[in-house]
Amino acid sequence: MTGRGGAKKSRAAGPAPPTTTLVLDNGADTIKAGFVSDDKSDGKPRIIPNCLARDRHRKIYVGSELEKCKDFSELAFRRPVEKGFIVNWEAQKEIWDREFFDDKAAQKCDPSDTRLILTEQPNSLPSLQTHCDQIVFEEYGFASYYRGLGPVFNAYRDIQSIFRTPQSTIDSPAQVILLIDSGYSHTTVTPILQGRPLHPAIRRLDVGGKLMTNYLTRLLSVRHFDMRNEPYIVNEMKEAVCYTSLDFKGDLEKTWKGTRGEKREDYLSGAGIAKDYVLPDSHTRFHGVVRDYEPGVSARARKGIVSTEDVLTLRNERFVVPELLFNPSDIGIRQPGIADLVKQSLLAVPIGLWPGLLANIVVVGGNSLSEGFCQRLQTEILKRFPDECRVRVARPEDPIISTWLGAANFAKHEHASKLEVTKQEYEEHGAAWVARKFAAGLGLDP
């Protein structure tokens, strides 16, 4: 186009690129959030409860406000994420608004000058993805945006450092890893090759932290006190006392009570397994306390002697709950356990990838913090593959924030600028074009 005097008129410059990136690992239990820019990073994310909670006095807590709660008894939750996917945007927006856009927000940002990198779980429904994209651009107006698979972002961490063989550049995707993510809603197995997820081989187990907490609640309510209205307290108890058994049958034998009228010595002594858990009283003690097993406490309770403390003695409850990850059929779930899922996943990829995948198994998510989890998983996987296969299972130092740290590294990589979508592109091409671009995933050749 020419103006007066024949001079060419330059096309209007597009909007300036965003100066900072907000990385959100939007989990069902917690949001991991932090800012990343070219010259600095938050280092570690802020962990925010992803829920709306109401106490028995009908006071409402939104997101991080839950930290102010002192009485966790009969706490009721409303969560925007179910089965790993955002299904309640009304609740999710209320949490995001308070945490990132309110004037008093600890991590306040201007979306018009911010790029958003958001995690999602594998195999999300296209309708949920499109709704998410619309909220990001039309409701909030972020300058640019990328929505990627949470497990895959872990490929942008220095995964080999866990195995004591660090790679030279931590922001390049790992060559090949098998990522097991066991979180609040479910457990997924994702093979990753050079930053690309191998979609046909992704497997999912519908056992996560929520189901295990519910199972522990049921056991306690049948054997001890009615805990059906105490999800927060039971979840704390699960995280404090449960462990993954390395000898399930042996531990079960040690905690067996014995025949009627004759209690076994192992049962009476606790066999090194039984623990006492002192419940919070909401006055002087706001969180439960784990103690070594004291047989006298149980005896006094049976005799009806009044105590100032409510104490639960946990025996096989400590290990039968995490066992669901390996044997979900114990409670009637017709799905294979984690080790069998790994085998199913590898059967869906070329056998030439097996050595690399089996030698680089990385576990993340809160359930991987269970004592003995990695050792048990490695043992179970070894049973399912030939003896010549080398199996290594490792867990990052903090598996809960591992996905966020990987996404923060990705934000500085050239792949991010290539795969992101700007608000202008969204307005020009529409949601379907955005969905196709995001479906390409990570690790494309530049």
Curated annotation (Swiss-Prot):
Question: Gene3D superfamilies, from UniProt?
Answer: 3.30.420.40, Actin, Chain A, domain 4
Query: One GO biological process from the UniProt record?
Result: chromatin remodeling
The GO terms this record gives for MF are: nucleosome binding
Keywords annotated in UniProt: Activator, Chromatin regulator, Cytoplasm, Cytoskeleton, Nucleus, Transcription, Transcription regulation
Q: Which residue stretches does the UniProt record annotate as biased composition, category Basic residues?
A: 1-11
Q: Name one GO cellular component term.
A: cytoplasm
The question of whether NAD is a record keyword is answered with no
Name the job this protein performs.
Component of the SWR1 complex which mediates the ATP-dependent exchange of histone H2A for the H2A variant H2A.Z leading to transcriptional regulation of selected genes by chromatin remodeling. Involved in chromosome stability.
Source domain of life: Eukaryota
Spell out the CDD domains in the cross-references: ASKHA_NBD_Arp6
Q: Where in the cell is it found?
A: Cytoplasm; Cytoplasm, Cytoskeleton; Nucleus
Instruction: Return the similarity comment.
Output: Belongs to the actin family. ARP6 subfamily.
**Quaternary structure per UniProt?**
Component of the SWR1 chromatin remodeling complex.
For the region Disordered, give the residue spans.
1-24
Know the name of this protein?
A: Actin-related protein 6
- Main localisation, per the record? cytoplasm
